[in-house]
Amino acid sequence: MSKECKICGKKPMVGNNVSHAHNVNKRRFNPNLQRVKALFDGQVRRIDVCTSCIKAGKVVKAPTMGQGKVTSAS
């Protein structure tokens, strides 16, 4: 699984851990990715999407089995 958002292309960034003694170690800041069943390129697929794209509404989630059924009120 690549650590990249399929919607916005957000990838890991490189930064530093800095201690009180100012010892510096390299580290990676990974995006908060979630595997979501969504409509992507006209198909329902599981894609890795960052939470900022989910919150912004850039992802169209796939309909579940219960959605879309019409029940009669008789």
Curated annotation (Swiss-Prot):
One of its GO terms (biological process) is translation. GO terms for cellular component: ribonucleoprotein complex; ribosome. SUPFAM superfamilies: L28p-like (SSF143800). Keywords: Ribonucleoprotein, Ribosomal protein. Pfam families: Ribosomal_L28. One of its GO terms (molecular function) is structural constituent of ribosome. Belongs to the bacterial ribosomal protein bL28 family. This is Large ribosomal subunit protein bL28. It comes from Desulforapulum autotrophicum (strain ATCC 43914 / DSM 3382 / VKM B-1955 / HRM2) (Desulfobacterium autotrophicum). The gene is rpmB.
